[in-house]
A protein has these predicted regions:
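Short glycine/serine/proline-enriched coil/turn segments at secondary-structure junctions
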Residues: 2, 28-29, 79-80
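Short active-site-proximal "capping" loops at secondary-structure junctions
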Residues: 26-27, 71-75
Length: 123
């Protein structure tokens, strides 16, 4: 039976139009992978509840409102017999960046220009 994974992420912009990314180090010998803040929807959670929780954990910011669904992508990994459905929501926030990821994977959270985002997401 295929494992179904649901992921929710936030697209957060600062007052200068820069995009918030978090740097993840999942034990890859110091190699940091940048993503939108977000994560797996846990049993009993809605996608929006997961997004709010993950943004708080990974960045210290509080989601003020979730405005709309910006995009959805589905990825299948036949080797692992998994299908991941990832959703990114445009949201607004308040507070200051203060990452406190309980899993210990977030090594950085900061806003990037669109050019910097493109460079960070290549890897």
């Amino acid at each position: 039976m295929r494992r179904e994974i649901l992921v929710a992420a936030a697209i957060l912009l600062d007052s200068r139009g820069r995009v918030l990314l978090v740097g993840n180090d999942w034990g890859r010998r110091g190699r940091v992978r940048y993503t939108l803040p977000g994560g797996t929807v846990e049993p009993g959670e809605t996608a929006v509840e997961a997004l709010v929780r993950e943004v708080r954990e990974e960045t210290g910011l509080r989601v003020r409102s979730v405005e709309h669904l910006a995009y959805v992508i589905q990825v299948e990994d036949r080797r692992k017999n998994e299908r991941t459905l990832a959703m990114a929501f445009r949201a607004t926030y308040e507070g200051l960046l203060n990452p406190r990821d309980p899993d210990g994977h977030i090594v950085e959270a900061r806003f990037f220009t669109l050019e910097e985002v493109e460079e960070r997401l290549k890897g």
